[in-house]
């Protein structure tokens, strides 16, 4: 028997509306499993799952799992959750999300995409190229792929592309045939203890690749480059802007709000070749780097140079990754998930690139919502220096994500640090209404307002253009 039998009975997902859980639930439903779930509140994911024919109950209660054969949870769900507690009491198997994803992966050959940043976009780009190459993969992603209107879909081929979440170490359960590592930065230190623990986990992830697979690694990132020499018994393909890369991006030029670039391909036993004029409809060098990872995977899987040239042309991106959500008075409102200093710096760099290439000119205005007190504490120095490409910075209150406040770690401390490091325009902002009032008197045609964070800042961004217009009309 290979994988979970489809006649196992009802599989119940606790927190089914979460971005990680919903994708697995949707794919399992499409494979013929009996799937249901519960969540604390209504939302777009819940609505989408119901539209697919999946029963979703609002609220967590023991009676929700009376007919369940298996209960699936994420590490964020505590054992005291009433559904989990009832399952344990009644000896119903309780499995972690990553364990269920690993079972799904046993059904397919898999591309597993890991990294501190960029994995959601990279996963989506890989899916786009494989689609273009008629490989038709199953996809489970950590963000909504605009082309699908979902973060998951069931394909017809033997291949699956998954985002491997390193936040709690559970990605070590995911043994990819092809493993991609985009970068390794200090993150999730509450789980790993220190940065050395993070690095060890990524090395273990790479070593999980089977002997017939490959590790695809970003040579531009110093910590990833340092890992290459430690991988002695698995095949490695590197990508990046470094001239030492096997898949090397060169001749990069911003064009039409995106990028055009060439790719030099170096494969053992073959002459170097150049794939010219790859069009990527996304700004920022970091997105070109993500695209190079996708190109490396597609080359490893035998896609043609023509597929690589045209595969990104219809790529619609990923929701909350530099997503335009509004326009007011000629200024653009962008919503982005970036919440780590490296991500923030990359997104603001892309925004400056877009402004600089525009005929209108303009400024970049960052609205940042710190996510978790522990992250802000652990990376405060980095946060204080990642906003250099923003002409103005407004910092909202910290999004707690279930954490208790930490004395001296808040929006005021971040703003004070920005000012002490020479930032000319940094201030706190209390709420969406205050933000709209402030920006109504400040933004001009050509400006780009970038709302950044993994919390509810996305709601601020969604209503910001209308709120500014109302303030100006008042």
From Swiss-Prot:
GO cellular component: cytoplasm
Protein name (Swiss-Prot/TrEMBL): UDP-N-acetylmuramate--L-alanine ligase
Residue spans crossing the bilayer: none
Subcellular location: Cytoplasm
InterPro entries listed in its UniProt record: Mur-like_cat_sf, Mur_ligase_C, Mur_ligase_C_dom_sf, Mur_ligase_cen, Mur_ligase_N, MurCDEF_pg_biosynth, UDP-N-AcMur_Ala_ligase_MurC
The organism's taxonomic lineage, starting at the top: Bacteria, Pseudomonadati, Pseudomonadota, Alphaproteobacteria, Sphingomonadales
Organism: Erythrobacter litoralis (strain HTCC2594)
Chief location of this protein within or outside the cell: cytoplasm
Protein family according to the UniProt entry: Belongs to the MurCDEF family.
HAMAP family xrefs: MurC (MF_00046)
Reactions that this protein is recorded to catalyse: UDP-N-acetyl-alpha-D-muramate + L-alanine + ATP = UDP-N-acetyl-alpha-D-muramoyl-L-alanine + ADP + phosphate + H(+)
GO molecular function: ATP binding; UDP-N-acetylmuramate-L-alanine ligase activity
Keyword set, alphabetical order: ATP-binding, Cell cycle, Cell division, Cell shape, Cell wall biogenesis/degradation, Cytoplasm, Ligase, Nucleotide-binding, Peptidoglycan synthesis
Keyword Cell cycle: yes
GO BP terms, alphabetized: cell division; cell wall organization; peptidoglycan biosynthetic process; regulation of cell shape
Gene3D superfamilies: Mur ligase, C-terminal domain (3.90.190.20), Mur-like, catalytic domain (3.40.1190.10), NAD(P)-binding Rossmann-like Domain (3.40.50.720)
NCBIfam families, per the entry: murC
Pathway where this protein functions: Cell wall biogenesis; peptidoglycan biosynthesis
Binding site for ATP: 115-121
Coiled-coil ranges (or none): none
